[in-house]
């Protein structure tokens, strides 16, 4: 019995460490999204300046205008590529998060079953609560992903209207940042929940296990 609880706690501790690692990855993605948003703002400002220069461009050679348009197109393509890479990273991060959350809930449920076998009512209540929390988190991610995909579809429908494409890219970046903030908040909540539950079980049900973890 003691060995089983110690193993479950060790597994839960390992999962918490993985959550911390993914929390760091979420921080990096948020920083990347912030940088991309700044670049989008710079592109908008650049577009405004181009419109102003168009007023006096009639007196300049056509080759100068062509060169400016080519440069703008390169910048937009680069921004789109970075957004694509960011979406891929976000998708991988979400998949890892869902897998870790599932394993984390399973380990905590096993721990509660091992320490509270005589009270099936509590076990059932906790199982339902964890299922609702996980479902709510998945629904949030699904909703944000749907909005992001819709923004991408709208962007693709605009054709060669460069100004509209820049606006849609900006919206896409905002949704990416908001989605990453949701995943990061979920990581922090899981970490706080794990700390509270570990403290409670160490003080009441499995004091010897806590001593074993400290030695490890």
Curated annotation (Swiss-Prot):
Protein name: FGFR1 oncogene partner 2 homolog
Family: Belongs to the SIKE family.
Major localization listed first in the record, in broad terms: cytoplasm
Originating organism: Xenopus tropicalis
Alphabetized Pfam families for the sequence: SIKE
Keywords (A to Z) from UniProt: Coiled coil, Cytoplasm
GO terms for cellular component: cytoplasm
Keyword Translocase: no
Coiled coil regions, renumbered to chain: 33-102, 131-185
Region (Disordered): 193-216
